[in-house]
Structures are given as structure tokens and as C-alpha cells.
Amino acid sequence: QPGDYTIIKPRWSAFFQTELDLILRRLDVRTVILTGTTTPNCIRTTCYDAIALEYNTVVLTDCCSSHTEEIQRVNLEDMARAGAILMDSASFADYGPGTVEDLSAAIRARMLEEDTVPEPFRSEDGQVFWPDLW
């Protein structure tokens, strides 16, 4: 479609050596929905990178695949333990993207409530930064 972005990824993760993170942040996207083939490779590495970059990460379980059901199950369980939200495409279609909890916002709200907001830090050139990527 006109205006759509095309990203060519050189490795398994869609974030590795691409501009995906920059594009998503500029568009204020905070949730990524993962689908595709070879769950243990492309889906899993993209999932871990998305979580590390503080995106709410959803894996549509019936829209990705592995060589065997056992490999698929184990990889999905591992991604869930890392923080991914697992759901099937019917559930996602029924509820839509607006129902995916904004985990980053919830963490920031709890930090403010508990007065545990991290202190800002200074870079070597004197600029002040907050640990929050958003």
C-alpha cells in the first residue's frame, strides 16, 4: 500500500541492523504483533529483541510455525516466560490491538506510585538522559 514501510532484514531478528526500531518509535508504536515462519529462529529472535527494546510483544500462535509441534510448543512457552503475550489470531481479531496491555506504561505508573523512578544520568558530554527509552 502507498505509505507502507518495507524493511529487508539481514538476519533472523527484524530489529538487527534495520531501522525498524527507529520507525516504530517515530510512529509512537508500542506494541508489535509477530507472525511468520520458523518460530525458533525469526519469530523468537525478533520477540526477544522487541521485549529488550520495551515493546509490548504479541505472538499469534497459529500464525507462526516450526518443524514439529514439540519445537513450536517449547519455543512459545519460552517466549511467554520472557514476557511475550501469546494469543491466536481469532482472539486477536475478536479483541483487536487496543486490548494489548501497555506494559511499559504500567511499569512507569507503578514506579511513580512507589516513588522508585530511576534518577537521570549524564553522558560524557553533559547531556541528561532518563533510562526510559520512550
Protein language model regions, located:
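Active-site-adjacent betaalpha module
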Residues: 1-109, 119, 123, 129-133
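Major-groove DNA-recognition helix of helix-turn-helix-type DNA-binding domains
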Residues: 113
